[in-house]
Amino acid sequence: ESLGITVQAYTSAVGPVKIDHSKMDLEEISNNRLYMPDKKAAAEAESYLEDMIQRKDSCGGVIECVVNGLPAGVGEPVFDKLDAALGKAIMSIGAVKGFEIGDGFEAAASLGSQDNDCFIIGKDGRPCKVTNHSGGTLGGMSDGSTLVMRAAFKPTPSISQIQKTVDRYGKEREIEIKGRHDPVIVPRAVVVVEAMAALTVADLLLMSMTSRLDKIKKFFKKEEI
């Protein structure tokens, strides 16, 4: 934040219930226990989770994270790509089974003419993108626009239904897990995704500061980089 960079994560989906991005209100995140920036979606998700509890089952969900204020050029074109580093960090979180940046998997069904982010000259006289399908990355580096990523979490494996398993003797058994278990773990992981994204961006920023010899010389001479 001291560099003008903000990292914000929130729940964008609980099971089949998804937020409406056109009606997003980030101030709504702290007003519900699911950390969803959509009041209507949060209410629907709460109802859906009540149904999960009654059915002794669980569901997964999606956490979206946006990074604003990140300057262009953070990352590397090959070995330390920004999107690859973020993918490694986010996929290291327990229960994460999928990761995407920008349009992600939806881009696979798009045409090049639909997915390409066109550039224009903005009001400040500098080049800017009309769209952000790439999610703020280009060639492994940040492009100066909002960085958008999503992490897919699997359903909580600890459910109260009777399930089949095999014991240590190789015999088929049935197992019934006792105790209280969350029907979804996504809300608990929002702050984890946010922290992992922030740590990764900070790490790459430090690497960027020492990526060129002239920058290193300025650092040791205590000059402004």
State what each model feature region is:
Residues 158-225:
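Internal helix-turn-beta structural module
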Residues 32-36, 88-92, 123-126, 173-177, ...:
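Glycine-rich loops and low-complexity Gly/Arg-rich segments
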Residues 55-172:
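Glycine-rich anion/phosphate-binding loop at the beta-strand->alpha-helix junction
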Residues 1-78:
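Glycine-rich, mobile lid/loop segments that gate access to catalytic sites or pores
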Residues 3-11, 52-63, 95-107, 208-219:
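Flexible, glycine/charged-enriched surface loops at secondary-structure junctions
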Residues 35-43, 76, 80, 84, ...:
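Electropositive phosphate-/nucleotide-binding environments in soluble metabolic enzymes
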